[in-house]
């Protein structure tokens, strides 16, 4: 029988009977199974974000270990993982319904060991060409793609009224990997903890040694552990199975492209600022030891993402998103007042404080826009199936599939911000010697998002 205990075991068995919208089923079985899958998914996604943003901590240190790359080249290394991550999120978003959440989570976590090991060896050899670092940075992008499949997978496990909180937790705590990496990397690069594997330090002017390989090697054992945990502890849902053909129609929805734009402004800002903040700070305030502070912004943004999902469940995603974009525009304007002019003036503490506010709102908006996506696409699909005379069971199944596909595809668009923001900073600095040009573009974009959110979802919320 489908209600046997076999599918419930934490052995990765396929669950054939899954009805999270049924209150009795949810209380008796569903909540326990969903929670277990969520809390294994979270550390897997957290580690993926650590790997995805590795170059945000490594690039700023490459000159210290003997590499002579230009500032624009270093910005490019921080930006490229977001390019491959964004492109790969599209196919990754379709993988869970094809292969199952357990199998795909284990596979996608395990393969991240490859760029981590390779980068550790590359940074120890100053003859390593720039092209090799480009390849490794693109491979780190596989980690960024994990977000699409992870969020799609978790969306299948939870009922509609709990999806905002669940997706907020998974995404928010997963996003925490950026700050965890930026906190841990500066600590471990000062320690000879992998000498047995060939890790060699480089003498610094202050007499200390920099073991840059540790910044990537430190994640390898944890990736191995949670690959095993995903394989044996998570479940595949038979009800989530769907071919790519069944998932593609969601791309025809106009709301998909509107929400992609809004998510680009929120999550794209979060991941873009995470990738480029350390390098930008180093160019504007060269005397500041920025890696001592860099982790604070992503940490606050990740916490805010969890809050954004839960807050949207209570107040409505549109309302939270609209207010959030207004705040992002205000903080972007304030940032101009904190920068030095011709190398003179400026206040790092004011710059840092405003950027923390931007990280906060980018994280909050990431959670609120994701909640909007879940609500919008579930309702659109259920209304369509009901209008066609379909059953409630079919409506719920197709709604879950469409929502997961939309979440994955929109997350791919959002990840592009991780490329554009650091690349925009690098290009603006190369052309004008200042990041102001890039910041003006961001400000205009946030104002446009205020107008779009109000025009499409604010005035016509009932529609």
UniProtKB/Swiss-Prot annotation:
GO terms for molecular function: nitrate transmembrane transporter activity; nitrite transmembrane transporter activity; solute:inorganic anion antiporter activity. Changing residue 263 to F: Abolishes nitrate uptake activity. It is a multi-pass membrane protein. The chain crosses the membrane at residues 38-59, 74-95, 103-122, 131-151, 167-189, 212-233, 254-281, 290-312, 317-338, 348-373, 406-427, 436-458. CDD domains: MFS_NRT2_like (cd17341). Nitrate binds at residues 89, 175, 263, 411. GO terms for biological process: nitrate assimilation; nitrate catabolic process; nitrate transmembrane transport; nitrite transport. Its main location: membrane. It is found in: Cell inner membrane. The gene is narK. Residues 1-37, 96-102, 152-166, 234-253, 313-316, 374-405, 459-463 are cytoplasmic. It comes from Escherichia coli (strain K12). The record marks 305 as: Important for activity. Keywords: Cell inner membrane, Cell membrane, Membrane, Nitrate assimilation, Transmembrane, Transmembrane helix, Transport. Changing residue 367 to A: Abolishes nitrate uptake activity. Nitrite binds at residues 89, 263. Pfam families: MFS_1. Each molecule contains 12 transmembrane helices, forming the N bundle (TM1-6) and the C bundle (TM7-12). These N and C bundles are connected with a linker loop between TM6 and TM7. The substrate-binding pocket is located at the interface between the N and C bundles. Substrate recognition is coupled to the transport cycle by the concomitant movement of the transmembrane helices and the key tyrosine and arginine residues in the substrate-binding site. GO terms for cellular component: plasma membrane. Residues 60-73, 123-130, 190-211, 282-289, 339-347, 428-435 are periplasmic. Catalyzes nitrate uptake, nitrite uptake and nitrite export across the cytoplasmic membrane. Functions as a nitrate/nitrite exchanger, and protons are unlikely to be co-transported. This is Nitrate/nitrite antiporter NarK. Induction: Highly expressed during anaerobic growth in the presence of nitrate. Disruption phenotype: Deletion mutant, under conditions for the induction of nitrate respiration, is unable to perform nitrate transport. The narK-narU double mutant is defective in nitrate-dependent growth unless nitrate transport is facilitated by the nitrate ionophore, reduced benzyl viologen (BV). Deletion of both NarK and NirC also decreases nitrite uptake. Belongs to the major facilitator superfamily. Nitrate/nitrite porter (TC 2.A.1.8) family.
């Amino acid at each position: 029988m489908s209600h046997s205990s076999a599918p419930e075991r934490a052995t990765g068995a396929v669950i054939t009977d899954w009805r999270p919208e049924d209150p009795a089923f949810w209380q008796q079985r569903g909540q326990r199974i969903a929670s277990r899958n969520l809390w294994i998914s979270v550390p897997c996604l957290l580690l993926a974000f650590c790997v995805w943003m590795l170059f945000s901590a490594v690039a700023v240190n490459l000159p210290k270990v003997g590499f002579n790359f230009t500032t624009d080249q270093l910005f490019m290394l921080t930006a490229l993982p977001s390019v491959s991550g964004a492109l790969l999120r599209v196919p990754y978003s379709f993988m869970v319904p094809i292969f199952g959440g357990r199998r795909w989570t284990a596979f996608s976590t395990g393969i991240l060991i490859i760029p981590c090991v390779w980068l550790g060896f590359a940074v120890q050899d100053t003859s390593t060409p720039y092209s090799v670092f480009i390849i490794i940075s693109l491979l780190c992008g596989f980690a960024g793609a994990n977000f699409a499949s992870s969020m799609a997978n978790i969306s299948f496990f939870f009922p509609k009224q709990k999806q905002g909180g669940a997706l907020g937790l998974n995404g928010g705590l997963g996003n925490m990997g950026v700050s965890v990496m930026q906190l841990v990397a500066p600590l471990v690069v000062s320690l000879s903890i992998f000498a047995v594997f060939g890790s060699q330090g480089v003498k610094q002017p202050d007499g200390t040694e920099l073991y840059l390989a540790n910044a990537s090697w430190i994640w390898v054992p944890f990736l191995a552990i949670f690959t095993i945990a995903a394989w044996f502890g998570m479940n595949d849902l038979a009800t989530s199975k769907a071919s790519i053909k069944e998932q593609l129609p969601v791309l025809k929805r106009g709301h998909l492209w509107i929400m992609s734009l809004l998510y680009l402004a929120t999550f794209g800002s979060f991941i873009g600022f995470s990738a480029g903040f350390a390098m930008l700070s180093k160019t504007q305030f060269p005397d500041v030891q920025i890696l001592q502070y860099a982790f604070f912004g992503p940490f606050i943004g990740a916490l805010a993402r969890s809050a954004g999902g839960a807050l949207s469940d209570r107040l409505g995603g549109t309302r939270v998103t609209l207010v959030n974009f207004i705040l992002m525009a205000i903080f972007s304007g304030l940032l101009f007042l904190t920068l030095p002019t011709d190398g003179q003036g400026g206040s790092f503490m004011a710059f840092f404080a405003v950027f923390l506010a931007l990280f906060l709102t980018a994280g909050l908006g990431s959670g609120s826009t994701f909640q909007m996506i879940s609500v919008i696409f579930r309702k659109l699909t259920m209304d369509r199936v009901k209008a066609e005379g379909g059953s409630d069971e079919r409506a719920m199944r197709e709604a879950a599939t469409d929502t997961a596909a939309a979440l994955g595809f929109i997350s791919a668009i959002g990840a592009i911000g991780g490329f554009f923001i650091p690349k925009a900073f690098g290009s603006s600095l190369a052309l004008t010697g200042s990041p102001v040009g890039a910041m003006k573009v961001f400000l205009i974009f946030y104002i446009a998002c205020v107008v779009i959110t109000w025009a499409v979802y604010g005035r016509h919320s009932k529609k």
